[in-house]
């Protein structure tokens, strides 16, 4: 890591390391926002701003990819919490016309079954199989213990086995 490549407020992060994982970070952000590209771009940009300003500080306790995925995950959760609050407030004032977000383009039986899983099971399956994280790293991204992550992972595999064997 060259000195000129290091972020001023995050000495363990380099621009080149962020560039190397950008595609994976963007893919993870897309999955956090129902594949809305503009929202995913905002999430990634906000994550990078937090890294640049030092608001999110990487200490090297995990891989950079795991850390940045965690930042994106937490930003998405915060965004949807705020959005849910606004919707609840709007519902008190008037009956809003709320439509469900569109689903990703892949309609295979497997991904339909994955989308039907509970949120944490769905997240761990995506992190492990699509984002190439270990169960331990995925657990850190999700903010749960490794044991809890393993339980969600095992339950997800059993549920998928059951759903796919009936189709």
Write out the residue ranges for each language-model feature.
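Structural recognition of an alpha-helix C-terminal capping motif at a helix-to-coil junction
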Residues: 42-49, 62-74
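C-terminal flanking helix
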Residues: 26, 48, 118, 122, ...
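Alpha-helical residues within the helix-turn-helix
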Residues: 31, 140
